[in-house]
Amino acid sequence: ILAAPTWHKSPNWQMSMQHNAREGGLFVVSTCMAIRKDDIPDKYDFKNLYPEGRDWINPGNSCIIDPKGQVIAGPLEAEEGILYADIDLNTITEAKRMFDVVGHYSRPDVFNFSIKTNQ
């Protein structure tokens, strides 16, 4: 399980997390900060830099992704909460069979990796 805390909230971040899940054959828990304008105390002047009527400074978008890259919980957008998901550890094996990043199914008859040590 990869825990990936972030401030980032865009759909691109979620796609990156889906890629990480597939490439690593692992579950990803993407925890994104959700913060409202009202969460900032009035004593901080920078609070006024946010436009009027904007409730959320960062809407969060936390999610849980399985090893096949599928979102199995969330995204939790513009709300506070806790995400839960039942995970099947067999999914890890299935995912790693489909996408082998370390090359267990590489073809030694086609590809050869060697290092010259005499130079």
Which role does the model predict for each range below?
Residues 1-86:
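CN hydrolase (nitrilase-like) catalytic-core segments centered on the catalytic cysteine
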Residues 92-119:
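Cysteine/selenocysteine-centered motifs that mediate thiol-based redox chemistry or coordinate metal-sulfur cofactors
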